[in-house]
A protein has these predicted regions:
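Bacterial Sec-dependent N-terminal signal peptides
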Residues: 1-27
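Short helix/loop segments within enzyme catalytic domains
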Residues: 182-192
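Juxtacatalytic substrate-recognition/specificity segment
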Residues: 21-172
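Amphipathic, positively biased hydrophobic alpha-helical segments used for protein targeting
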Residues: 11, 61, 189-191
């Protein structure tokens, strides 16, 4: 009798642990979010003193436009901050927003949201797409340049500086996001 009670207790404990499988949360795990790339692209690049531009196939005209705009935006923001950018900015251009969503680079948890004209940033890499509107494209470029510049001013230009200053300097995200938004758009009734 004692032995059968012991077996029953062991079986109940094991069955209790197995029943937790019904609360599996694997579909909400953040790893493994690969995106399907529908086409193979032939990438090219331009190298400039302060930035590099990576583009593909029919994006040559867009890359030329980005080069002119980035020079203007960067010099304007450097003058405004009285600070010269030390690291090169890496611009990656996609011809459409759908093509930018095919990329695994800069894969963020809130990937289903619309970027709304703001550039995605990963380190000093700025990912932009052209939606046919030069005003939106300029806004993405200025936003990307502003974010890279602000991050370099606050955290430094070397990885060791970023780690050291990231532990010491802790600005709230709303401050940095607000500053970058202010720098990337002129004040108007729409932005207020």
């Amino acid at each position: 009798m004692q032995r059968s009670k012991g077996y029953i207790i062991i079986i109940l404990i094991l069955l209790g642990n197995l029943s937790k499988g019904q609360f599996y949360n694997g579909s909400q795990v953040d790893f493994g979010k690969n995106r399907v790339q529908f086409n193979d692209y032939l990438w090219s690049h331009y190298k400039y003193e302060q930035f590099n531009i990576y583009f593909y196939e029919e994006g040559k005209n867009i890359a030329d436009y980005l080069a002119r705009s980035a020079h203007l935006q960067l010099s304007s923001l450097e003058t405004q901050f009285e600070y010269k950018l030390k690291r090169k900015i890496q611009f990656v251009i996609y011809n459409t927003q759908n093509q930018s969503r095919e990329s695994n680079i800069g894969n963020y948890p809130n990937e289903n949201s619309n970027t709304g004209g703001f550039a995605r940033i990963s380190g000093n890499k700025v990912f932009v797409y052209f939606d046919g509107n030069h005003k939106n494209f300029d806004k993405q470029i200025r936003s990307g340049v502003a974010k890279v510049l602000v991050n370099e001013i606050i955290y430094g230009d070397e990885l060791s500086d970023e780690i050291k200053n990231g532990a010491i300097i802790n600005f709230p995200s709303w401050f940095k996001d607000g500053l970058i938004s202010y720098l990337s758009e002129k004040l108007s009734t729409e932005t207020e």
